[in-house]
Design a protein with these regions (language model features):
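Active-site rim/loop-helix segments in enzyme catalytic domains that contact anionic ligands
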Residues: 1-42, 46, 54, 58
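Intrinsic-disorder/low-complexity accessory segments
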Residues: 41, 47-48, 53-55, 59, ...
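Detector for the c-type heme attachment site
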Residues: 77
Length: 441
């Protein structure tokens, strides 16, 4: 998993012996924290395909969805004493995986085995690495219709140019490269021989008429939260629409049982009758069906639960319409304002706060709810006082940041509240520049 490849290579070049040492205790085989496993933000990109929290993931799935390959291999490395792993995968398989996808993995594995047996190379299959959790480099492609597979070669961050395994064998970088090359070419070979079937079965995968739920509805109770999820769906090229006013029957996520939900035009609907319908099922279904409780990773990831939405899954396709374009917030400078106020409701508000601090704008926050000039604010509201920010560019900077992050600012001419705390209260505290220390050793 070379997400931090440059970090690993730079470290290795600093400590390697010439010629290389095969002793497991040599410094070149004991990579320090944080290792080359994660990216710059110490995130495991191999678990980020579906969630796309990292910029690398967003860029990767954009390319993936441009091509939508029939075959996708995720080449990895594992511990030095585990020789080589290739398809077929272990149970559990998600139920959307077709019989063809299952069976062709076995054909691919047998083709690899032919070449490994000839050379006397060790390998294993059908262990450890299952096809359930949707955010891997094998499952994500699988749920997009491909034959998605993980190939794991012994080595990882320990092997360097060569290392002696616990069995006394010397594993070299050349060995590792040849093994991956062999399975790679074997994959191309068996795929080429089955090109017609690959095409026809790939097409069949996108028939979503047999899916249990036809529509998933997300209740819009927080526009920031909804916008965040819409951006994620856009990355995966999953279509969504606005609900039409009415009442829907189906599986209510909040009670985990059958129920009803009143719909408004601000709610969104994701239908399974679309090219990415099976991925919609995988990401939105209330409970993934488990064929085997022993699995390599988590078993619950349903987006409505993960993002905190009231939601309903309907067995009938609900009426919907095209989503209206989001309105743009445009704040204006108010030089006579005593203070600007911004509500605190979402992660986006925290992003806005961070941007203010980076521009040396001093905000305060209220620990208690208050009302002022006829408007009510819950605790956590940001209060940006003119008296705390006495520089000529204060208003212009604040408005520019608020407009950039689409935060609506309320201006007030006084710090005297209608009810609740006044702005000089000890419950209204300044937020100073934060300095974070990371201790390592």
């Amino acid at each position: 998993n070379p997400d931090g490849r440059d970090r690993y290579v730079n470290w290795f070049n600093q400590v390697k012996a010439t010629p290389y040492s095969i002793d497991q205790n040599a410094k070149e085989h004991v990579e320090p924290w944080p290792s080359g496993r994660p990216n710059h933000y110490l995130f495991d990109l191999n678990r980020d395909w579906a969630w796309a929290t990292q910029v690398e993931s967003s860029q990767r799935i954009a390319i993936y969805n441009k091509w939508l390959p029939h075959i996708h291999v995720d080449f990895h490395e594992q511990g030095i004493n585990n020789p080589y792993y290739f398809a077929p995968a272990a149970e559990p398989f998600h139920e959307v995986i077709s019989d063809w996808q299952r069976n062709f993995q076995t054909q691919i594995g047998k083709n690899h085995a032919k070449y490994f047996d000839k050379e006397g190379w060790l390998y294993f299959t059908r262990e450890s690495f299952d096809l359930l959790y949707p955010s891997y480099g094998d499952t994500y492609p699988t749920y997009m219709g491909a034959i998605g597979m993980t190939y794991e070669q012994a080595g990882h961050g320990r092997a360097g140019l060569g290392i002696q395994t616990n069995e006394g064998e010397v594993l070299t970088l050349k060995d590792r490269a040849i093994h991956h090359m062999t399975t790679g070419l074997s994959t191309v070979e068996i795929s080429s021989k089955n090109a017609v079937l690959l095409n026809s079965e790939f097409k069949k995968f996108f028939d979503n008429s047999n899916l249990k739920y036809k529509s998933y509805v997300l209740k819009n109770e927080n526009q920031d939260k909804l916008n965040r999820l819409k951006k994620l769906l856009d990355k995966h090229e999953i279509r969504y629409q606005s609900a039409k006013e009415g009442r829907a029957k189906g599986y209510l996520y909040s009670i985990q049982d059958q129920g009803k939900m009143d719909l408004t035009s601000s709610d969104i609907i994701i239908h399974t009758d679309q090219p990415k319908g099976k991925m919609v099922k995988v990401l939105f279904e209330p409970k993934a069906k488990l064929a085997d409780s022993l699995t390599y990773d988590i078993t619950a990831w349903s987006l409505p639960y993960a993002h905190g939405f009231d939601a309903i899954a309907s067995k009938t396709k609900l009426p919907s319409s095209n989503v209206a374009k989001d309105s743009t917030i445009k704040n204006s400078i108010a030089r006579s304002a005593y203070a600007y106020i911004s509500k605190w409701n979402s992660i986006e508000d925290a992003t806005f706060l961070g941007a203010l601090l980076q521009e040396n704008i001093v905000p305060r926050f209220s620990e208690k709810a208050f009302s002022i000039e006829g408007k009510s604010f819950e605790r956590g509201a940001l209060i940006i006082l003119r008296n705390d920010n006495r520089n000529a560019e204060f208003d212009a900077k604040l408005i520019a940041i608020a407009n950039k992050y689409q935060r609506s600012l309320t201006t007030v001419a006084t710090g005297f509240s209608d009810s609740g705390v006044d702005f000089g209260s000890y419950s209204v505290k300044p937020i100073n520049q934060q300095k974070i220390a990371v201790i390592s050793g």
